[in-house]
Amino acid sequence: MSQQVIIFDTTLRDGEQALQASLSVKEKLQIALALERMGVDVMEVGFPVSSPGDFESVQTIARQIKNSRVCGLARCVEKDIDAAYEALRVADAYRIHTFLATSPMHIATKLRSTLPEVIERAVKMIRRARNYTDDVEFSCEDGGRTPIDDLCRVVEAAINAGATTINIPDTVGYTLPYEYANIFSALRARVPNIDKAILSVHTHDDLGMAVGNALAAVNAGARQIEGAMNGLGERAGNCALEETIMAIKTRGQLMNVHTRINHQEIYRTCQTVSKICNMPIPAHKAIIGSNAFAHSSGIHQDGVLKNRENYEILTPESIGLKQVQLNLTSRSGRAAVKHRMEEMGYGETEYNMDRLYDAFKALADKKGQVFDYDLEALAFINQQSEEPEYFRLDTFNVQSGSSVIATATVQLRCGDEQKTEAATGNGPVDAVYQAINRLTEFDAELVSYQLTAKGHGKDALGQVDIVVQYNGRKFHGVGLATDIVESSAKAMVNALNTIWRARQVEQELQRKSQVKDQKETV
């Protein structure tokens, strides 16, 4: 009988470490809800002790998620374990994931400890975590480079202490598939209590082996795969879950395994992660890239026309990629737009219909026809703009050319006040940014700028993603319009609104801290 492989998603923990700018609580929740729709069994959503913001994110997600187990990371340190519990306790189902290095290199140079001391510390912290929950995962950090005798000792002790999942990370992406599989085979053969825990894999892609290593380990008896959507993660990234899941769906019968993932949600989830994280998906990316189902060779095209299975081992529809796209016009009513959103998989709670329809009408008036990719882009911007906006772009005007200095005049609403400012710059976008910075007095430094066409042709929407730095922190902004200068301006205003909200939160935390100090003094 086919056995289930548990899918453990770490996009919001390990995956986020690859991003230029940290995600907001709202952005993390959007991704968590998408992962829940896709059906991940466990989602690791943060490192609660690391910062108040991460604690809040984990707690917020733990309250909202009902159909997946929510997990928080913790070092083998008492305060980490306690913080993870406090953040997760509001969840319907949760897991505490604690870890400690086990390789000789890490023990000697990073921990400055010994293997017996590592085992003693791991056992103590696993027991502490078990006081809070019966679902505790222990990771042997750098397990791929840990001698098998040492690994067996650690794993046996961890299971005896109460760990229900044992994770063996290939932390630096060093092992080859057959080596990694041999580790799991040895653990199953040599650890006497191994049947009391689920063996888990966590692979990195430094040598391009992450997915191959994960599948090799599953073939050797692992029954949980840890990874991130789109392969996000430290350095070269984590195991790409969408690839691993579809490999199991397509070839799982050879390993006698399956997952409980809703495959129809894979494409949409990957797109959500890509947009929110500002990490474009390469065209040649397996499963979800724009070329994944494209055929340019004449021989291949002929074969596909005769029978798609000649050159396609899975279908676009199997990951939720719809091949038929309907276009709407300015004459399309609210019901038509709502119906199309439902057909694309969007529930009513995922967007504000009034705001979406207003944006749809404005776009339809500009370009005539609105396609599925336009609606998806509008829905994404709609989700990003639901927070209160202190700054709002009213109008702008630019003058530029090969023989004149670019000049921009920007009218911005700042709270209840309307302000206007003009500035020059190195091109129209820079001129607009100079004017906006003068109006807001934030002086945010542009770190990165990225323009992506949403659709095809001269009237395609242009999405601008920027990262700005302010007071040592990086913030992401996104804007969408058929005019790239307008989308650039909207992206900057979006980033500045995020900065403004962050400042409000910091001021509120400072106020609460002062009140607390005053009460303690009294």
Swiss-Prot record:
Gene Ontology CC terms: cytosol
EC number assigned by the record: 2.3.3.13
GO molecular function (one): 2-isopropylmalate synthase activity
Binding site for Mn(2+): D14, H202, H204, N238
Pathway: Amino-acid biosynthesis; L-leucine biosynthesis; L-leucine from 3-methyl-2-oxobutanoate: step 1/4
InterPro entries the UniProt entry points to: 2-IPM_HCS-like (IPR050073), 2-isopropylmalate_synth_dimer (IPR013709), AIPM/Hcit_synth_CS (IPR002034), Aldolase_TIM (IPR013785), LeuA/HCS_post-cat (IPR054691), LeuA_allosteric_dom_sf (IPR036230), LeuA_bact_synth (IPR005671), PYR_CT (IPR000891)
Top EC group: transferase
Entry keyword set: Amino-acid biosynthesis, Branched-chain amino acid biosynthesis, Cytoplasm, Leucine biosynthesis, Manganese, Metal-binding, Transferase
GO biological process, one term: L-leucine biosynthetic process
Regulatory domain, as annotated region: 392-522
Occurrences of domain Pyruvate carboxyltransferase (ranges): 5-267
The keyword Cytoplasm is assigned to this record: yes
Pfam families according to UniProt: HCS_D2, HMGL-like, LeuA_dimer
Catalytic reaction list: 3-methyl-2-oxobutanoate + acetyl-CoA + H2O = (2S)-2-isopropylmalate + CoA + H(+)
Subunit structure: Homodimer.
Role: Catalyzes the condensation of the acetyl group of acetyl-CoA with 3-methyl-2-oxobutanoate (2-ketoisovalerate) to form 3-carboxy-3-hydroxy-4-methylpentanoate (2-isopropylmalate).
Family note: Belongs to the alpha-IPM synthase/homocitrate synthase family. LeuA type 1 subfamily.
Matching PANTHER family: 2-ISOPROPYLMALATE SYNTHASE 1, CHLOROPLASTIC-RELATED, HOMOCITRATE SYNTHASE-RELATED
Record protein name field: 2-isopropylmalate synthase
Organism of this sequence: Erwinia tasmaniensis (strain DSM 17950 / CFBP 7177 / CIP 109463 / NCPPB 4357 / Et1/99)
Gene encoding the protein: leuA
